[in-house]
Amino acid sequence: GYVTDILTDQAIKFIQQPRDKPFLLYIAHKALHPNVVQRDDGRVVNIGEGDFVPAPRHEGLYESEVYNRRPNNGIAPLDKPALMQKIDSLPPLGPETATKEKTIRERAEMLMAVDEGLGKMMQELERLKLLDNTIIVFTSDHGYWYGEHGLNEERRLAYEEAIRIPLLVRYPPKVQQGSKPDNMVLSIDLAPTLVQLAGEALTDKFQGRSLVPIFENSVENWRSSILIEYYSDTVFKKMKSMGY
């Protein structure tokens, strides 16, 4: 079967289980990643380099689609500090290494199974009369480059395209439908948000901040800056060359 559909089916089976207390369902789809297998020794191997496989029913769905690139497409950041110019393990930008339109289309087609899966889970919650009493959070771990800054098929530098990701929250008792706040939020804000929405008291052990005041339009003194760090060897090498 198609792994996105399998994960969706397992999630729905979990939702259907009889229970007398609230539940937490966390589902992390592998869709948008290339076609890989895990060997018995734990190694993860690409079985088709750059091979992005949509569900059979979605193959060719966007075959004629052309995705507009951003104005900074193909412009290498040579005026930036060495830390921001490239990832050492990646080849330089060029006709052979640039992200192809086919790759972008196939990844968009892969997303269709994710979209359908979320819809099926919401339909099941509605059938069980749980939908409006369930907090639904949809987000990602990072963005991607498709030629922006002269960088391709990566995300390990702190550019806007890599660090600014979707965060969608549905919870009618607290979140106004159609609202689009522009506050700067982080993934570490999710834990205190869910704890507060569940009716529990917050402690100073949380690194993040609850988003409930944003939902209620009562936020004060929200953050205006963030620190981005990553464990990539590239970063450490460049910092060392800068005297750190």
Model-flagged regions — what are they?
Residues Y2-I6, I12-K21, Y26-V185, L197-K205:
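Active-site-proximal cap/lid insertion segments
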